[in-house]
Amino acid sequence: MAEQVLIAVGDMCGPPRKNPGAEATAALARRILKAYPDAMILALGDNAYNRGKQDEYREHYTPTWGQPDLLGRTWCCPGNHDYRTAAATPYFEYFGEQRAGTPQRSYYSLPLAAAGWHLLSLNSEIDQDAHSPQLQWLRQDLAGRRFQPILAIWHRPRWGSGAHRDSKKPRWFLNELYAARGELVLNGHAHHYERFAPQRPDQIPDPQGFRQFVVGTGGRKLTGRTKDTPNSEYARFDKFGVLKLTLRPDAYKWEFIDVDDRVLDTGEQPVNQRGR
């Protein structure tokens, strides 16, 4: 059966003292790519600490996640640290328009044709309310995708059980994705791994809702649990690693793999049938 493998993670590279895991997670991604040469990497923001400057990308991202075999398979979304440099210009210059968008339109979509899915890369660091250009674009992009499974990435998670505060901003994204029967939401920002049960934008459990993953485990120093969040099914606060997703037209499988190649969390679920 046709499938698409994805390797997703955020919050990777920077000075080694505060980013001790980037080299190991990049090596892990390389091992997965060796087994799955057509896999895609999804970089979930805050790729080069602390300000997303040009020299930080050059000195910290390039030697690890920015090597040609990984960079050539990477698509991304920007994080809050990227915008600590004016307009996140180094981020857009480093990844290029095809894989990052532009400062003027920093969101994009592309088909995952092998699996029949649709990928959205959104920007949680700019306006996203009902009248914003980004949300208007999102509505247009989602129109007519009733029969296509949808995966969306952006940096700040709506919910999480770690040290970073929940963000209300993505509620606009979630409302549109739920209405379009979106399947998966992938975020970084919080420096831990967490998987949520399918739910609605108002946090009500719904077997036909979207499933959120937080994967801020790319290398930045990890943070611990600070609260218990409704619908959280599994979380790890002590392991660097990546989320490997295997997408098929009728289902998806997830595996959180740590840098020692151990699968710490795994499962499989049929795609959403609500309204199809």
What are these regions (language model features)?
Residues 27-30, 49-150, 164-184, 191-244, ...:
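Extended active-site neighborhood of metal-dependent phosphoesterases/phosphodiesterases
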Residues 153-157, 189-190, 257:
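Short, well-ordered beta-to-alpha junction loops that form the rim of enzyme active sites
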Residues 187, 195, 266-268:
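Residue-level detector of high-confidence beta-strand sites
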